[in-house]
């Protein structure tokens, strides 16, 4: 199904280590590979410290990778410099996890949203600039009265909408949403996700949606990658990963998702993942268990998974 679609982002055998050579070095990404196809939402899920945010930042070249290659529209991101890097920044944007920290508290909303327009010279004059900002506010469900306010005057959900408007201002092809709802109240989370889904369908955007909530990732994503200890352990369609998880870590994540039905919640069996198998020294690689469903496994483990 995905083979005939255009690859927008290709992550190939990427590794990244922080504090390399020091006593406190951390291998944040360990030989990770995946593709993101044009027009899809690729969900990346895992617990805190799994490396999912680091992957997102590496794709935007906010971190320099140690090994491997990241391509965007066929161009290697690590080789981009000067004008080519400047143009890439316009095509790929990020929605940050903390809407409060990611907005300049001393700038008005009008200027926050218009900053990308100014940097990339996408407007001709002040009237054009104001009209464009107003259109973006309308798009995310805010109004013109908000233009002259500061970030601290808004709720968390409204601030995240401002962050979304800022990301959309330069008309990107690709947006990395780094846990965009984790800092929001539960009642607001669905509103923001529905807004992102609506904008994605209307504008043909491609998302990398990073989160730790598997049920929310399933709701918005076409395909899901599951990360643990810097490695991707499972990739498949959202339905396959959610309803037919194969890797023990994915199964443990899903077993922790609460059930709204109290009867089912009492019957739910929690699966505790034992990572000791990952430390046995054996080489593991992504292997296709069912069509389009890949799991990090040895050859023997893959055979066992296929029999289940």
Swiss-Prot record:
Enzyme Commission number(s) of this protein: 7.4.2.6
Job description of the protein: Part of the ABC transporter complex OppABCDF involved in the uptake of oligopeptides. Probably responsible for energy coupling to the transport system.
Superkingdom in the source lineage: Bacteria
One GO molecular-function entry: ATP hydrolysis activity
Coiled coil start-end: none
Family to which this protein belongs: Belongs to the ABC transporter superfamily.
Protein name per its UniProtKB record: Oligopeptide transport ATP-binding protein OppF
Organism of derivation: Streptococcus mutans serotype c (strain ATCC 700610 / UA159)
Gene3D superfamilies: P-loop containing nucleotide triphosphate hydrolases (3.40.50.300)
Membrane-protein topology: Peripheral membrane protein
Known catalytic reactions: a [peptide](out) + ATP + H2O = a [peptide](in) + ADP + phosphate + H(+)
Residue positions binding ATP: 46-53
Self-association state and partner proteins as the record states: The complex is composed of two ATP-binding proteins (OppD and OppF), two transmembrane proteins (OppB and OppC) and a solute-binding protein (OppA).
One BP term from GO: peptide transport
Segments passing through the bilayer: none
Subcellular compartments: Cell membrane
InterPro entries given in the database record: AAA+_ATPase (IPR003593), ABC_transp_ATP-bind (IPR050319), ABC_transporter-like_ATP-bd (IPR003439), ABC_transporter-like_CS (IPR017871), Oligopep_ABC_C (IPR013563), P-loop_NTPase (IPR027417)
Enzyme class: translocase
Keywords linked to the UniProt accession: ATP-binding, Cell membrane, Membrane, Nucleotide-binding, Peptide transport, Protein transport, Translocase, Transport
Gene Ontology CC entries for this record: plasma membrane
Domain annotation ABC transporter: ranges: 9-254
Main subcellular location of this protein, as a coarse class: membrane
């Amino acid at each position: 199904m995905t083979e005939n679609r255009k690859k927008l982002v290709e992550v190939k055998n990427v590794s990244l280590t922080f504090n390399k050579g020091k006593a406190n070095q951390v291998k944040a990404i360990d030989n990770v590979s995946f593709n993101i196809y044009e027009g899809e939402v690729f969900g990346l899920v895992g617990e805190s410290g799994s490396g999912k945010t680091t992957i997102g930042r590496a794709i935007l070249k906010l971190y320099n990778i140690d090994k491997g290659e990241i391509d965007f529209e066929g161009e290697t991101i690590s080789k981009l410099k000067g004008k080519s890097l400047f143009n890439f920044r316009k095509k790929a944007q990020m929605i940050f996890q903390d809407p409060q920290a990611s907005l300049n508290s001393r700038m008005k909303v009008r200027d926050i949203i218009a900053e990308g327009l100014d940097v990339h010279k996408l407007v001709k004059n002040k009237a054009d600039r104001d009209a464009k900002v107003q259109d973006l506010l309308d798009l995310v469900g805010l109004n013109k009265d908000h233009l002259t306010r500061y970030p601290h005057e808004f709720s968390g959900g409204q601030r995240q909408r401002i962050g979304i408007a800022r990301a959309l201002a330069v008309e990107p092809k690709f947006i990395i949403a780094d846990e965009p709802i984790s800092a929001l109240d539960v009642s607001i989370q669905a509103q923001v996700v529905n807004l992102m889904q609506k904008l994605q369908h209307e504008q043909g955007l491609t998302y990398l949606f990073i989160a730790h909530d598997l049920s929310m990732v399933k709701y918005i994503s076409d395909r899901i990658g599951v990360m643990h200890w810097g490695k991707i352990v499972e990739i498949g369609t959202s339905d396959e990963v959610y309803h037919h998880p194969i890797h023990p870590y994915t199964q443990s994540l899903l077993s922790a998702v609460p059930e709204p039905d109290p009867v089912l919640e009492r019957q739910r069996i929690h699966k505790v993942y034992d990572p000791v198998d990952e430390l046995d020294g054996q080489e593991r690689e992504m292997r296709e268990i069912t069509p389009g469903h890949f799991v990090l496994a040895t050859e023997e483990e893959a055979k066992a998974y296929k029999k289940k």
